[in-house]
Design a protein with these regions (language model features):
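Short, low-complexity disordered leader/linker segments with a strong preference
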Residues: 1-43, 351-355
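Short, glycine-/small- and polar/acidic-enriched structural segments
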Residues: 33-179, 183-188, 192-199, 214-215
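Surface-exposed patches in mature extracellular/periplasmic domains of secreted proteins
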Residues: 77, 116, 175, 259-270, ...
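Pocket-lining segment of extracytoplasmic ligand-binding domains
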Residues: 102-103, 181-185, 189-276
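Short, surface-exposed acidic
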Residues: 170-174, 276-291, 331-345
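Secondary-structure end/capping motifs
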Residues: 241-328
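Conserved C-terminal helix/tail region of periplasmic/extracytoplasmic solute-binding proteins
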Residues: 315-355
Length: 355
């Protein structure tokens, strides 16, 4: 479930130069010029943040159940671009994509003009783990002097350093770049610990026997919510075609709400609609069960009684995390220069299309 500080780091680094050009010249494509197909539906492109997984499941459900069609939309779900979904949305290659407020903030400081219009995940799911067979690591302070399997982001370095220091360590560690997977890097003993997600890799570990010893960010001094996963679009689309944004958000919201209340059926839909991902139904069902039981998308009782609107952006939790990253000097601009001021979460998120 690669959505932020792990797998996206390479895409963020690779798109810096492109963003410099975008900041200077504006968006190269007009994503609001959506064409109508023969049935009168408006064609819309949604880009994955990584491989198909339960983070994306609501979009697949919305397409399968006809929610997009009912809204007058013909949605094409496409693979993530090499430069990342955020860059694709920023320059108009995709109308919408899955991302998170953390990434939106990072890209905004590099010149992107994008916003999150719906937040699916409401609490952190990142877990930082060693193999259970590694008896030298009993808590984060034992990461001191060990080797971190990383995708190369300043963000993950800041998180690990804070967790180690909160647990009484110095916050010093070596790093090795992950190859094909963090699991493989740890198993080959090229690294001692790495990052995973409880709702995806954590489920894989439980089901397929690779036992992990894991620690969570909130327990070790990392404030706010880093994992504010949701749907993004660009500022130009919001200003010039708000009706399109509202239709897409409303239909997508309906898809995620269905998945949250019908997790097994939604799992079957994801497996069917994303055949190239070769997902196992039992695994996807367990991932959804983890999401529902952990209330990762919000408290179902509050959603049902209307005291919480599904999809609301947690700008408070995001800002707490942004401020932490700024304190740790984890932000840089499009030229690689350190930025000491955190992005303002309230300026890169909107709930106006949820209503």
């Amino acid at each position: 479930m690669k959505k932020t500080i792990f797998s996206k780091a390479i895409a963020i680094l690779g798109s810096i130069a492109m963003l410099v050009g975008v900041a200077a010249c504006g968006q190269s494509n007009d994503s609001t010029k959506t064409a109508a197909d023969g049935n009168g539906l408006t064609k819309v492109t949604f880009m994955l943040s990584w491989a198909p997984d339960t983070n994306h499941i609501g979009v697949y459900v919305a397409k399968n159940k006809g929610y997009f069609k009912q809204a007058g939309l013909d949605v094409d779900i496409v693979a993530v671009a090499q430069a990342g979904a955020e860059q694709a949305v920023n320059n108009g290659m995709a109308d919408f994509a899955l991302s998170n407020l953390t990434n939106v903030g990072i890209y905004t400081l590099k010149g992107a003009k994008i916003k999150q219009v719906m937040q699916v995940q409401q609490k952190p799911s990142a877990i930082w783990c060693s193999l259970a067979s590694n008896k030298d690591i009993k808590s984060p302070k034992d990461f001191d002097g060990k080797t971190f399997a990383t995708f190369g982001s300043n963000e993950s370095d800041a998180v690990i350093r804070r967790m180690i220091q909160t647990d009484g360590g110095k916050g010093t560690f070596d790093k090795v770049t992950v190859g094909t997977s963090t699991f493989q890097t740890l198993s080959s003993k090229k690294a001692d610990f790495g990052g995973f997600y409880a709702t995806w890799e954590g489920v894989q570990a439980d089901m397929y026997g690779l036992k992990l010893n894991c620690f969570t960010e909130p327990d070790y001094g990392v404030p706010g919510n880093a994992d504010t996963i949701g749907v993004i679009t660009n500022d130009k689309t919001i200003s010039s075609n708000p009706d399109l944004v509202r239709k897409f958000v409303q239909a997508t919201k309906k898809g995620y709400e269905y998945a949250y209340s019908h997790p097994d059926d939604a799992a079957a839909i994801l497996v069917k609609e994303a055949p190239d991902a070769n997902l196992k139904l039992a695994f996807v069902k367990k991932s959804m069960k983890t999401i529902v039981n952990g209330q990762y998308w919000g408290d179902p009782t509050k959603i049902k009684d209307g005291s919480f609107v599904f999809g609301t952006n947690d700008t408070k939790g995001a800002q707490q995390y942004f401020d932490f990253l700024a304190e740790e000097n984890a932000y840089t601009d499009a030229h690689g220069k350190t930025v000491h001021t955190a992005p303002a979460a309230k300026d890169i998120a909107t709930d106006e299309f949820l209503k």
